[in-house]
Amino acid sequence: MNKKVKFEDLGLIDYKKCWDYQEDLFSGILKVKSKNRKENTINPTNNYLLFCEHPHVYTLGKSGDEKNLLVNEEYLKSRGATFHKINRGGDITYHGPGQIVGYPILDLENFFTDIHKYLRFLEESVILTLSDYGLSAERSKGETGVWFDVGTPNARKICALGVKNSRWVSMHGFAFNVNSDLSYFGNIVPCGIIDKKVTSLKKELGQEMDITEVKNKLKTHLVRLFEIEII
């Protein structure tokens, strides 16, 4: 099993450009696995972890409802935002500057073949990062992501998850609000959940955050949880 993971911080990158890059990496892993099956070989598969930020964009998962986008295309243009229907799970979400978007493109057969464990590890990496800043976050039963004050009227989400998995190869991932402009979430019903709010690390701590520092903490927790070697 190859537990080496190539890490790339892509910085601020167009959503479609990054999506195409993910698809190329994802397809490359699947091709190796297909060849191994057909030829009864054991060629190692690569693993990748991408961090990035996106210009303002809304994405709708394959099980989502377009009615959860509350504004029209003209309004999106006026706010410098775009909209994409994509092939991950989940409903609608927002990406923008100040948000850490993580795309683990992993052959889970190098780690473990349990999609629920995979999602819980992604959530746990964010929960542990928030703990580093003195914040106590949690999961919400029946919902993915990372939350504060679950079960109260002030329940609010700081990290959303949406992944695709095929033959144990993952793509897409998580969106962690650090210095995000939360007003953009007002244009959607985030993740299709009507009665919940969203928040950011900046809002919780009342100050602009060093996003590079947050990325480093997050990466450290991912490395430990998945027992990976960054290359």
Language-model segments: residues:
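Long, positively charged amphipathic alpha-helical accessory segments at protein N-termini or as interdomain linkers
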Residues: 2-10, 110-158, 163-231
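N-terminal lobe of the biotin/lipoate ligase/transferase fold
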Residues: 1-155, 209
